[in-house]
Regions:
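Alpha-carbonic anhydrase
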Residues: 1-323
């Protein structure tokens, strides 16, 4: 009886430990309880929790990298890049600290009726592009995976489009040089802002596990933006021409859909029409919302020649300005 009394006395204290609703800390609070739940899942506005965060800020995504390399791992296409100075990173939104860019990889299926890992409103899409970031203090993605706040993956759904998406085309054009597994080639280089749409609001966030081929499970934050990419039938055919480790066409590399298990799905800073969970593809590409980081602003000579338009220019009053 004494033990039960003590447990009852401690219960209110446990509840009081939860951060206040509306804070970024309240989102992090649920990682302990939901970070081990399986992924991917279906997301939708229905059943999600509307939650407001500061604007998500995209730093250095207009800066040209020194090189961009794509690799056919035999399981996916992996895109990595290197910069001579500071790499792109995220700040703001649900992040209290800087999260730097790590890599991009893709998931696809054997036809246009499958391929995406996540579904939206129970609908499957032909492909999905996942962009991985990690908390800068952990130095590497592998180290960051061992911390519940270490890694975030942004999952862009790829819809079917009659025309080719130019944002994907400069990547797809390199596939003929990496048809065999474990082969790589350089492409571009172009800034990451040319590959995927940036957003500062209107996205879903949830906690879930990332399983590796070694059987390890890591807690990851998954972001699914309402903004999407699109791919033509011909572009998707190029994905299916890539070989797996057994010298066969890699036709399917997506994981099966998992149950939601009553976890929190945060609908961060909703803004546009909520008639559909995904936004329509804009007829005209959205202008870049990338920000130049203080490191480049104070040392503009670190910018590559292709970014001359970002260099400080002297105005009529003799003052420097960024154009």
């Amino acid at each position: 009886m004494e033990t039960n009394d003590k447990e009852e006395e401690q219960a209110p204290e446990e509840i009081d430990k939860a951060p206040p609703f509306g804070s970024i800390e309240w989102i992090y609070y649920w990682s302990e309880f939901e970070g081990s739940l399986p992924t991917p899942i279906d997301v939708s506005i229905t059943g999600s929790l509307k939650y407001w965060c500061p604007d998500l800020e995209w730093y250095n995504f207009d800066v040209y990298p020194h090189k961009v390399k794509i690799t056919n791992t035999g399981y996916t296409v992996l895109l990595g890049a290197k910069w001579r100075a500071e790499r792109p990173y995220l700040l703001g939104g649900p992040f209290s600290e800087k999260h730097v860019f790590s890599q991009v990889h893709f998931h696809w299926g054997s036809n246009m009726m499958e391929g995406s890992e996540h579904t939206v409103d129970k609908r499957i899409y032909p492909a999905e592009m996942q962009v991985t970031f990690f908390k800068s203090e952990y130095m590497t993605q592998q180290d960051a995976l061992r911390h519940p706040d270490g890694v975030v993956i942004i999952c862009y759904l790829i819809k079917y489009g009659v025309n080719s998406d130019e944002r994907l085309q400069w990547v797809v054009e390199g596939f003929t040089r990496i048809q065999e597994a474990q082969t790589s080639t350089r492409i571009g280089p172009y800034p990451l802002s040319r590959l995927f749409p940036m957003f500062f609001e209107d996205y879903f966030l949830y906690w879930g596990s990332l399983n590796t081929v070694k059987g390890e499970n890591f807690t990851v934050r998954w972001l699914v933006p309402r903004a999407t990419l699109y791919a033509s039938f011909e572009q998707m055919k190029e994905f299916r021409k890539l070989w797996n480790p057994w010298d066969e066409p890699n036709l399917r590399n997506f994981r099966p859909l998992q149950e939601r298990h009553d976890r929190h799905i945060f609908f961060i800073s909703p803004h546009w029409s909520q008639y559909n969970s995904l936004l329509p593809i804009p007829r005209v590409p959205e202008p870049s919302i990338a920000i130049l980081s203080p490191a480049y602003k104070t040392r503009p000579w670190l910018l590559p020649p292709q970014n001359a338009d970002l260099l400080p220019q002297e105005n009529e009053n003799g003052e420097d300005k960024i154009i």
